[in-house]
């Protein structure tokens, strides 16, 4: 997903100063019962319990390093929308084609509402602990294990996003070059091979950007990326009315088959239906960016940030649904997991323009995500001090691994499927609910909320138990030919 910068510094929330409890003071007025020269054990137990409470307040305040936010509500909505928006939008028409309009709308609405609820849980956890960094929140609640799990989930999500962006380069750059050369799609040469081009782009453009110590241009790329995706949506809607369904079925000779192929399906099930929910989940993940955006919000409060998330998710819901429905109604069951790849840019300046804009946007966004993944690795290895040789070596090795994956992964649906059922599920369902349940473990006043959070956690676990085996089963049963190529 498009990630929000927040000054490349993840600030933390400062809670109200915890008032000192007079009962916990070491007053000389405390009365100590002595029996046979020994202090009453009940008193010791009570004293230790109160000291433990004081220590817990001190622990809570470890996260209270606060710089007041300066970002307006409107700009925060824009930043969160940037964080939500990503390559997932290109796979939604494919998800709709394999579920039907009605079922897709139900799934899209459900994931939108559940994502908003998970952010609500995350904000409550942040308020209770005072932490404004996702990883530190995990460490505060679950210790080192929590920190490692959140690092792993966010790194996998960012890696999946990078893979999808580079897959767009692999898919779209050859078509753009052929169009600029005036060649047909059938034209083949080594310099229009997507595998060669993605390696050239990675080590010619992305590597130098990733080697920088800081990314000063980060604030500009997210806005540019969101603008490109909005431009893409406008083109998708426009092309629906410019592309007759008959042209999709160029090889069809039977009009009855064409008529059937051009009829929208409202509910459908097939072997690719399993990818719908992971793709939608992948498209809505923004949780690692929520707390940094919250920390920058002017006059922040949980209610105000919840309003930011509600507006952002509603806007993305509308944008996602429009892209999916118009993309589907243009190509019907012939739509691919990369919607943009289905449009022919030869002789079409509009498609060529949007294709080039999206390519530039994703190329500039990859280093942003790469910085996050590399920083996480250095943090885990406790190698936070800058070292040039290590910096260069790790960067090159990671980019080689990512390129190999992009070259051999057959289609974008596989990326959406794997990341959707693993890290996206963790970040949306499992982690926020687990953190909330742990934090409110001793709070008897939140019984109803804890039941809902437990059901939410169970839903995430169920999602994994059902989706992961089905995705693996589809891989095992898939033929050599793939629609995503």
From Swiss-Prot:
Domain of life: Eukaryota
An example molecular function term from Gene Ontology annotations: proline:sodium symporter activity
Membrane association type: Multi-pass membrane protein
Subcellular location: Cell membrane
Tissue expression as described in the entry: Specifically expressed in brain and retina (at protein level). Also detected in spleen, small intestine and lung.
Chain ranges on the Cytoplasmic side, renumbered to this chain: 1-74, 134-148, 212-216, 295-310, 370-391, 436-450
Protein role: Symporter that cotransports short-chain neutral amino acids and sodium ions from the extraccellular to the intracellular side of the cell membrane. The transport is elctrogenic, pH dependent and driven by the Na(+) electrochemical gradient. Participates in the astroglia-derived glutamine transport into GABAergic interneurons for neurotransmitter GABA de novo synthesis. May also contributes to amino acid transport in placental trophoblast. Regulates synaptic plasticity.
Protein name: Sodium-coupled neutral amino acid symporter 1
Species classification: Eukaryota, Metazoa, Chordata, Craniata, Vertebrata
Gene name of the record: Slc38a1
